[in-house]
């Protein structure tokens, strides 16, 4: 028993990871079976937020308390997350998507291939237009990169044209989108990206 697609969502604190998971679940749940695993170091804050927002029924959302480095829990020792995913897959078989949201981390964050099938990395404009050219696995190797909160560009003095140029250089043809998740900009493109990666046959 497994899900068709395990999707990792990573990025710095406050970039919009939970907002992305919320938005995607609301967009996809009419047509797909979905579950969520969230990561926090000492709490289950993100899981409780999604439960309170009624993004999915409560049983489909598991909060993992990693107790340490967010990166370790999704890469070097992903056993807590892997067990949570397996629990959901056994309980709600069949599932189309399982989203695994990492705790906030730096640009070196990446998921173990044992845990997810593809990864989405979220950065936001408020961190400055230099972020894409700083590189790191999240920028260069994620399956999809999102540059969120584009509405804040003028307020923080970020140049979206510079971010676009640097991102295209760093990504080397890999997909990426500008987004403003608070009003739905980019959601349709992300949804189509995910749907295009669903295997034809369940494992």
Swiss-Prot record:
Keyword Kinase carried by entry: no
Pfam families, A to Z: cobW
Question: Biological process (GO) annotations?
Answer: urea catabolic process
Function of the molecule: Facilitates the functional incorporation of the urease nickel metallocenter. This process requires GTP hydrolysis, probably effectuated by UreG.
The UniProt similarity line reads: Belongs to the SIMIBI class G3E GTPase family. UreG subfamily.
How this chain assembles, per its entry, is: Homodimer. UreD, UreF and UreG form a complex that acts as a GTP-hydrolysis-dependent molecular chaperone, activating the urease apoprotein by helping to assemble the nickel containing metallocenter of UreC. The UreE protein probably delivers the nickel.
Q: What is this protein called?
A: Urease accessory protein UreG
- Organism, scientific name: Prochlorococcus marinus (strain MIT 9301)
